[in-house]
């Protein structure tokens, strides 16, 4: 499950991506992003800082400053964002790529039936989320994209 913070980050990125597609894109202020996305401004400031540190958005100072998308939507990996914003995504610590820890109550990882079942579910999830980009999320809200698929 993704956190509310991650949902806010995705909403902000979708607004920035929509703005980047306009004929004359402008940097968006935190207020504009908050209004367009329905995200509380007080959370957005911290989230945009995290996204800037991750190299996904740029901040521009000055009168016409604000935030803009630094990468093309197809180059923004959703799984990398989830890990950056929410931390490890594995359902068990013994399945985590980045924060592996053996389970305290497990004596034999290779024979653990709980691990085996959740590993199968998790790997299926990883195949999907590792291939997901911001571009995919933009297309999900576009009725024309569905027509092109048929």
UniProtKB/Swiss-Prot annotation:
Disulfide bonds: none annotated. Residues 1-139 form the HTH rrf2-type domain. GO terms for cellular component: cytosol. It comes from the Bacteria. Keywords: DNA-binding. InterPro entries: TR_Rrf2-type_CS (IPR030489), Tscrpt_reg_Rrf2 (IPR000944), WH-like_DNA-bd_sf (IPR036388), WH_DNA-bd_sf (IPR036390). One of its GO terms (molecular function) is DNA binding. PROSITE patterns: HTH_RRF2_1, HTH_RRF2_2. This is Putative HTH-type transcriptional regulator rrf2-like. It comes from Rhodobacter capsulatus (strain ATCC BAA-309 / NBRC 16581 / SB1003).
